[in-house]
Amino acid sequence: MDEGIEKNIFVNLESQIDGVCPKFYVNVDDIDIIHEPPEFYQRLKKLIKKAQKRIFLSTLYIGKEERELINCLSNALSNNPSLHVHILADQLRCTRESPGCCSASLLMQLKKKFPDRCEIKLYHTPNLRGLRKQLVPHRFNEGWGLQHMKIYGADDNLIISGANLSRDYFTNRKDRYYLFSDKGLADFFFKTHFLFSQLSFECIPHLSDSSIQLSSTSPVIPFTLKWNNSCPNPLTNPQEFRVAASAKIQQLLQGNREKFLSRNPSKPLSSVYGSELINQAGDDNNKPFHKYEESAIVYPLFQCVPILTSDVHSTEEKVLSIIGTLLSRKEVNWTLTAGYFNVYPALRKQLLKSEGIGEVIVASQQANGFYRSPGPSKLIPPAYQYIAEQFLKDSRKKKRNIDVLQWQNKGNTYHAKGFWLSTQHHKHPFLTTIGSSNYTSRSQQLDLESTLVVMTQNEKLKRKFSTEIELIKQHTKPMNTCQLEKVPMYVKALTSLMKKKL
């Protein structure tokens, strides 16, 4: 009976998400969960070193001092003449320190050495341009939107994460990392990378005789940004840019769902993009077979509101709404974590309507990357603590069985985000989400985000989901038992005013 409840929930959820976004089937043995920052870095470098055809990295930024990573990419290109490297990052974040040393200037070392086999693309939000861009300080311009996806591919391997490519994310900034060894999924995300690259500026080196120098004493800016795409420039023609971008993205978001829904029902493992499980035993002439117990279903979700017209909708919010509806069932338990916990209103409402057991894992002030930082950013940790306190207070008012746990591990910061769902009589989750989104109003409306829903009935993978949660919870305490730093009244007021930017 209990098995039937979970299977019924699983199948119904699958049928609902099928109509929204692309779908892949991945063998559970081809999914590996990485737990710690140093392991993430070592695995990433290993994938880069072994790559034969392609490396594609979509990230917010590469740390301006990450010479080891750049050298790793350079060595891979030197050792394999057929290898190409494609990097997509955010322009505002990668040029913030310019004309000083910045992420973009570091990347130019690679571009200069391999001009024909290294592509650097920097996305710029259409929301910040003209006089406003000139007036907003560099430290704050990210508040108008970013390229926030974290997709790291090498040949047919893919790491989906929330981590950026900088020193703290390689050492002591806790995040989540899923490694997939699946050609269909890797091909899809390479196409995704290419699509968003077509909506971004190319970053190329300046010739030495035409470098930009602001004054006789200022450093030379070693790069220039060129718009050489077929669609309009987002900084000069934002509306036309959105129309063109929407046309390109719509097929990606929907994943040819008409073709998918009309597929041969006798071969349910054949996805739109060709990712499938094969019967290696050869008993059925290598035809795809359908066994929930041996596979995981993977749905790629995207959030890209700032570059879409009003008639085209992102898939992340739709699918999270479907998942959120499940929380009203008493059989469903859930865990949600976000280093920056400030879920958008519709999701917050669904969480507070949940009938099962719920957990929210948040960063303590000390585990927030902005703790005791200079300037106004030092107010960010108490602001997020206040938001978490308010959520806990509201859940108590509604008599919901929800705990808020604070994560703290001395010398480390916390950046993990994602959902896990399980049923009452099953310890191990059957679903998780993994990716870049913090599920905030800001990420929903301003940033480019990529998330995966991973569902399975395989006990081995479900136990891996459980292990991941347990390792995170090793460093947590219930918020109502912690000695919390007092949040000043002015921070509470500012948080209420600026909530959509957090």
Curated annotation (Swiss-Prot):
The active site is at H148, K150, D155. Gene3D superfamilies: Endonuclease Chain A. Pathway: Phospholipid metabolism; phosphatidylglycerol biosynthesis; phosphatidylglycerol from CDP-diacylglycerol: step 1/2. Its main location: mitochondrion. Its EC number is 2.7.8.5. One of its GO terms (cellular component) is mitochondrial matrix. Keywords: ATP-binding, Lipid biosynthesis, Lipid metabolism, Mitochondrion, Nucleotide-binding, Phospholipid biosynthesis, Phospholipid metabolism, Phosphoprotein, Repeat, Transferase. It catalyses: a CDP-1,2-diacyl-sn-glycerol + sn-glycerol 3-phosphate = a 1,2-diacyl-sn-glycero-3-phospho-(1'-sn-glycero-3'-phosphate) + CMP + H(+). One of its GO terms (biological process) is cardiolipin biosynthetic process. InterPro entries: PGS1, PLipase_D/transphosphatidylase. One of its GO terms (molecular function) is ATP binding. ATP binds at S58, T59, L60, Y61, I62, G63, K64, E65. PANTHER family: CDP-DIACYLGLYCEROL--GLYCEROL-3-PHOSPHATE 3-PHOSPHATIDYLTRANSFERASE, MITOCHONDRIAL, CDP-DIACYLGLYCEROL--SERINE O-PHOSPHATIDYLTRANSFERASE. This is CDP-diacylglycerol--glycerol-3-phosphate 3-phosphatidyltransferase. It comes from Schizosaccharomyces pombe (strain 972 / ATCC 24843). The gene is pgs1.
